[in-house]
Amino acid sequence: MNAYEANFDGLVGPTHNYGGLAVGNIASAESALTNSNPREAALQGLEKMKRLADLGLMQGVLPPQERPAVSVLRKLGFTGEDATIIRCAAKVAPGLLRACSSASSMWVANAATVSPSADTEDGKVHLTAANLPSQFHRSIEAPVTSAVLKRVFSNERYFVHHDPLPSNLYFGDEGAANHMRLCPRHGEPGVEIFVFGRSASRDIPKPLRFPARQSLEASEAVARLHQIKRGKELFVQQGPAAIDAGAFHNDVLAVANCDVLFYHEAAYRDWEETEARITKACDWPIHFIRTGEEDVTLAEAVRTYLFNAQLLTLPGNEMMILAPSECRDSHSARNFLERVVQDAANPIAHVEYVDLRQSMKNGGGPACLRLRVVLTEPELDAVQENSRVILDECLYNDLKAWIEKHYRECLSPTDLGDPALLQESRAALDELTTILGFGSLYDFQRP
């Protein structure tokens, strides 16, 4: 059966700002409390989506969450009208307001883990929204993430939704950013690789500088929930030194597509053992495209997000890399990519660069912005039954006009305390749900 790998990208929200919230995210820390440009950020993300759609790839769109999250501030003791709550939080707890205003839901690689129907015992697509307990500003996303995914993938004949795991560090789950899949072709059964940084129950090496986010126990639970076919799941440990260098998720240093694993050798605790285990689990040859310190240092790989590129199969079965423009500007990263595409021994034939500087300054590259979902033709038809989330020229034009209408060009840290920003954001999201055919999605839209 024909199948497509659809990339569902998160739209950048109107409150995109540099709050410096993410522990272990070096770019986020370096950009903390500087001015952002939400309009530019959203347009950059949309242009990336448009480029992939123009290449003939299946490209979807997921909406941002409502921010500032006034309902969360109420749970934390702030009272009064919405405007009063925002002003008070800005005065007495500005860090809390920044967290509740974060547009981090744009990085939908952390939204969920998705297993395609070819990999599961019941032949259905399984989705588990990530609980993200390691960072407060992300831990509040799971309920709306679940609602969005259930709206988009609503047909119970094809899709199974699991609740987020219990929200604690024992089951810390960061979604698809720590999950990869290898397969002969997208529609065929594959091997799912779950990458963890720590274990709550086993004594394993740990990073020293930054905390590991994904637990082995969470990865094992998601694999069980998804009913992955026996022997077709692997659990691999991140390199502790990589986490300390700023690779807070596996997708900062590795990306897989079909029969290719493109990665930095520091990504895993033992890269040789990892390759051996993958080779044993797969019934088809795997192209391991690996680099190390001699070609691209770990620090440069993290700075440029070289391996947070998207690795894509084009119509015609050639592969291409969509890398952040920071890689083009880096001598070592650019040279490595040029050598990869010139090597006829691997399927990667092209590289393109994309400007995502607004997202990159917050520590999110091309792969952070997308959730990969392999869909058969009937599954894709089911997605399009009740919503308008697959990008075409008309939807692109509508979204571009929507962004230009509603988004500010500059947002400073103090602007987060402006109650007008909440009203602007709600007006934007209210219109967006109409554009996407969602109906009422957000709390403010309900009586």
From Swiss-Prot:
GO annotation, biological process: arginine catabolic process to glutamate; arginine catabolic process to succinate
EC class of the enzyme, as a word: hydrolase
Active site residues according to the UniProt entry: 174, 249, 368
InterPro entries hit by this protein: AstB_sf, SuccinylArg_d-Hdrlase_AstB
Reaction equation(s) it catalyzes: N(2)-succinyl-L-arginine + 2 H2O + 2 H(+) = N(2)-succinyl-L-ornithine + 2 NH4(+) + CO2
UniProt keyword list: Arginine metabolism, Hydrolase
Binding site for substrate: 19-28, 110, 137-138, 213, 251, 362
E.C. no: 3.5.3.23
Hydrolase keyword on record: yes
Pathway participation: Amino-acid degradation; L-arginine degradation via AST pathway; L-glutamate and succinate from L-arginine: step 2/5
A Pfam family hit: AstB
MF annotations from Gene Ontology: N-succinylarginine dihydrolase activity
The keyword Hydrolase is annotated on this UniProt entry: yes
Family that this chain belongs to: Belongs to the succinylarginine dihydrolase family.
PANTHER family linked: N-SUCCINYLARGININE DIHYDROLASE
Assembly description: Homodimer.
Protein name: N-succinylarginine dihydrolase
Gene giving rise to this polypeptide: astB
